[in-house]
């Protein structure tokens, strides 16, 4: 398990855009399982939506990407590099995510070669699927 401090030592994201609270499982370069405790204090709930707060789907995808970045950048040869989104395919949102939910984020890489990777991301709340799709990323030593 990785704490928030250990996550911040691997990826450059910071509040309010750091969207994972801990890593529960990690196989460097292969897969990671992360967790986001969704609270009413999240800045995006002020406008999405004031009377019915729902976590924006694009931020669920970003949380999956950050989880994947932890897995990719945990490899010794990738330390200090940056992971950039290269694309997303087939993303589907199945259920809304509300304040009070614990978002479980699992990313598994299907292939990774020469700094380009592709994987599958699945987000669940209480075992129920809320989002899934394919994520593509590129690693770079230049920020």
UniProtKB/Swiss-Prot annotation:
HAMAP family, A to Z: FabZ
Protein name (record): 3-hydroxyacyl-[acyl-carrier-protein] dehydratase FabZ
Q: Where in the cell is it found?
A: Cytoplasm
Q: Which gene encodes it?
A: fabZ
Q: Where is the active site?
A: 48
Q: Name one GO biological process term.
A: lipid A biosynthetic process
Return the NCBIfam families for the record: fabZ (TIGR01750), PRK00006.1 (NF000582)
Main enzyme class: lyase
